[in-house]
């Protein structure tokens, strides 16, 4: 019986190690993940909270970002085909951020900041303009997998929806994550920033920005001077800030003035 003891112990140890290694681990989720084209990325390149606008990427795609302290951000850009009229392709852009929980069973529970989500729907064949609205949708992801893709050799993330339907595979694009501030960016009368101390750390100042006037319960327009929003948003270059029309007319004026001075 003694010779059988060692193999049994080894088998039990191997099983224990495999069980431990299979436990959910937030650290492996940390970073910004994007589908293959990498055209869609979370952060200020997709949603600009200063102007409250969604920025259309060059290609459709999905991006998720996660932090080790339990915050997430997601960006979706999808095309919706029209079988009856193939030339009439609609599009949907969605952006959310908030908090997530990695559950013991490996599932993910995503709870967005309810007032911050944005959705832009465009149907050029049925509407003269796009529809821009607030968007708030909690999510449950049944499971996830992080591994090295055997074909691309890149770190890959597979997410599965609540019913087990796989989301398009994503690959690690940034680590640490490329994200907007992990707090409420567009507070309303019924929702405030996540933490005043956290806000102050972002701002670097002791006072929070004043709230603009309200309209139908929403703060409109957004506080464009709020440093916790504008920080990290790329400012336009000097060339982009120059009024080219003004330069042209100034050139015309100098030419006329020079010609008149020459004749005199």
UniProtKB/Swiss-Prot annotation:
One of its GO terms (molecular function) is unfolded protein binding. Its main location: endoplasmic reticulum. Residues 1-22 form the signal peptide. InterPro entries: Rot1. GO terms for biological process: 'de novo' protein folding. It is a single-pass type I membrane protein. Residues 23-243 are lumenal. It comes from the Eukaryota. This is Protein rot1. The gene is rot1.
